[in-house]
Amino acid sequence: MELTDKASFRDAMAHVGAAVNIITTDGPAGRAGFTASAVCSVTDTPPTLLVCLNRSASVWPVFSEHHTLCVNTLAAGQEALSTLFGGKTAMDERFAAADWQTGATGCPRLEAALVSFDCRIDQRVSVGTHDILFCHVVAITRHPEPRGLMWFDRGYHTLMRPAC
């Protein structure tokens, strides 16, 4: 099938499952956070993630001024928090909906996250409508009971560790 429009691309990408993340930052430009599924590992030497952020997003000006962020991968049952950070809700309301700690980079770290990656942004690359942030991981916090949350086919799905 030849790709002819962005709707076809988006429909195809809906069939690719992804972890659900809340990306947070804090610093001179303020505190901000957004929901993202366009996050993945790049390499383990040095430990690096990439985060994609639309330059038209309301949080873009804040993230563009900061050099650190925290990738908070959501656990099962945190769908409402994902929706809150994915909408037009005021930042104070978003952060008031959960318990946060200050991570190693000074960014908000979600206490109940499946895993949190505190990162230093090492590089930014603009592609189309988005900035790709290459993030060096400086600290990791893991939840003791892994129950994942995935975004697949435009909906949330829970992942559980097999009993065997």
Curated annotation (Swiss-Prot):
Coiled coil regions in record: none
Question: Which reactions are catalysed by this chain?
Answer: FMNH2 + NAD(+) = FMN + NADH + 2 H(+)
EC nos: 1.5.1.42
The protein here is known as FMN reductase (NADH) RutF
Swiss-Prot/TrEMBL GO biological process terms? nitrogen utilization; uracil catabolic process
Flavoprotein as a keyword? yes
Q: Which domain of life is it from?
A: Bacteria
Q: Which family does it belong to?
A: Belongs to the non-flavoprotein flavin reductase family. RutF subfamily.
The answer on whether this UniProt entry bears the keyword Disulfide bond reads no
Q: Which GO terms describe its molecular function?
A: FMN binding; FMN reductase (NADH) activity; FMN reductase [NAD(P)H] activity; riboflavin reductase (NADPH) activity
Keywords for this protein: Flavoprotein, FMN, NAD, Oxidoreductase
User: Function of this protein?
Assistant: Catalyzes the reduction of FMN to FMNH2 which is used to reduce pyrimidine by RutA via the Rut pathway.
